[in-house]
Amino acid sequence: MLSASDLRKGLKLDIEGSPYIIIDFDFSKPGKGQALYRCKMRNMITGNQLVKTYRSSDKFEKASLEERKMQFLYSQGEEYHFMDNENYDQLFITKDMLGDNIYFLQDNMDVDVLFFDEKPIDITLPIFVNLEVTRADPWVKGDTSGTDTKPITVETGYQLQVPPFVEQGDKIQIDTRTGQYVTRVKQ
């Protein structure tokens, strides 16, 4: 059991049988009475947000989550298939659950899959992925309509802004946390 003083951003709790992650946290101590802990939380299954205020005497149950190393195998329609690296069991995760992570998945990529009650609820990708540029419009020197970036599309269909020197066929490194360009990869 956790007490209210253990609450912090990023902590995963079991609230009414569902896993929640604390995304914002505020502590206040009024002149009289107990300290109050105000938590903004996100349901890790539905994505719904919840704001609750707790007293210092409240107790909490840590969410029973399990993380497993898995390998992405392939996608088929709306399903993305993964294999457990330890026992070789296979499972699929829907496109809706993966969200924008689908743009960074590559065949045979190792990922961490988070489970709650033996059901996958989230994946953690490597921080950086290298993807090939499949479409890059030419950049016109002297185009002063804004910043010195241009839109491109990579092999997975993801679109982003990159410096003008990036050309079609180049491999680039992308930060999976932000979806932004990091550097061009030497081939």
Curated annotation (Swiss-Prot):
SUPFAM superfamilies: Nucleic acid-binding proteins (SSF50249), Translation proteins SH3-like domain (SSF50104). One of its GO terms (molecular function) is translation elongation factor activity. One of its GO terms (cellular component) is cytoplasm. Coiled coil: none annotated. CDD domains: S1_EF-P_repeat_1, S1_EF-P_repeat_2. Pathway: Protein biosynthesis; polypeptide chain elongation. Gene3D superfamilies: 2.30.30.30, Nucleic acid-binding proteins. Keywords: Cytoplasm, Elongation factor, Protein biosynthesis. The keyword Transmembrane does not apply. GO terms for biological process: peptide biosynthetic process. InterPro entries: Elong-fact-P_C, NA-bd_OB-fold, Rib_uL2_dom2, Transl_elong_fac_P/YeiP, Transl_elong_KOW-like, Transl_elong_P/YeiP_cen, Transl_elongation_fac_P, Translation_prot_SH3-like_sf. HAMAP family: EF_P. Involved in peptide bond synthesis. Stimulates efficient translation and peptide-bond synthesis on native or reconstituted 70S ribosomes in vitro. Probably functions indirectly by altering the affinity of the ribosome for aminoacyl-tRNA, thus increasing their reactivity as acceptors for peptidyl transferase. Belongs to the elongation factor P family. This is Elongation factor P. It comes from Desulfotalea psychrophila (strain LSv54 / DSM 12343).
